[in-house]
Amino acid sequence: MNDTTHKTLEVEVLNIHKGEYLSEALKRQGYPMLPSNAIINKVMTGTGATYMELNPKLSPRNSIVIEPYRSAVENKVQAFDEVQGVFKEVTVKKLTAYLNNSNIKYKKIITTPEGFQTKVLKAAKSLKMNIYKEFFNLYDKSEHITEDTDYRR
């Protein structure tokens, strides 16, 4: 029998006022950025969680955002100048050059799960980067990733 320790997440309810963005609600309640090791069940779309993480003024840290679909990656790349999208056309070499670009203080990568596995991890390995320590990772729309992998309880 597998003796695994089960951990539970502490539930904390944070309220978003009508017309308020998630970044504003979090800051009002003591969180300067999206918290680590948390599941945010924000129920409604368009509150700005991904925008907050991809904006270096709102989230001054290196970030990797994983989207379930390429179309979401494409749409969000268009909204930010210094965000590196990972598509079929983006090579590991190009991604490595982005990660080495000293003119970009906070690296922001947006990718699909496949791009993360086949390109982001390879680029990080080639640079001897520990992206698990050097980057914040946001799984956007994680419910889609779970559904698409046919998760069963």
Model-identified regions with their sequence ranges:
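Pre-Walker A adenine-sensing motif
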Residues: 3-35, 54
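A general structural signal for short secondary-structure junctions and capping/turn motifs
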Residues: 31, 55-57, 98-103
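Pre-Walker A (Motif I) flank of P-loop NTPase domains
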Residues: 32-41, 60-62, 107
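Conserved helicase ATPase motor motifs in RecA-like P-loop NTPase domains
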Residues: 40-51, 70, 141-149, 153
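Conserved Walker A/P-loop ATP-binding site and its immediately adjacent core
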Residues: 45, 49-91, 114-118
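Structural recognition of the conserved hydrophobic beta-strand(s) that form the central parallel beta-sheet
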Residues: 65-66, 108-112, 138
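Inter-Walker segment of RecA-like/P-loop motor cores
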Residues: 81-131
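Signature of the SF2 helicase/ATPase Hel1-core->accessory helical subdomain module
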Residues: 115-153
